[in-house]
Amino acid sequence: LKIGIIYGTNASGKTNILNAMEFFRMLVLSMPKDRNKKTGVVPFLLDETSRNEKTKMSMSFYINKLKYILSFELDSKYIHSETLFVYESIRPTKLYSRTYDSNTDSSVIEFGSNLKLSKKSQDTISGNTINNCSVLAAFGKSNVEKTKLNDVYDYFAMQVKDVLAPGM
């Protein structure tokens, strides 16, 4: 997609869609300097319930004719869950899933066997994935073998461009 245009009336949420897309891109690519840095998520503040709920984000995209779905559940401090699935057939295959364990204050990552990632590389990525950092951002800063994660990381780094929006 070379260009996209969003139409709508004033105050209908057009800029919020663009802000969410840019936030998602930065969540995938940016590695926080330390574990105490906020994730940057801003909850919906107009009702009491939403203020205290986690934000859920999901994006479907295609790379080399394969469908991927990347999902996050996060709040201002932690990424509570993150999953990446690929559709090489009609059924989804898990490339990884990550959950935050509040008892140990750490993330647990399960890599799918289809990813073909060595145990050493899995440990490296897991060690680099702090609570406010996506698995893909940690992968991008890790010296590990080439896998489908390269395709996804490179897609966000080279194909998904900065969003141009009013005030951005």
What are these regions (language model features)?
Residues 13-14:
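Conserved lysine of the Walker
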Residues 1-5, 18-70, 75-76:
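Conserved P-loop NTP-binding catalytic core
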Residues 8-9:
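P-loop (Walker A) phosphate-binding loop of NTP-binding proteins
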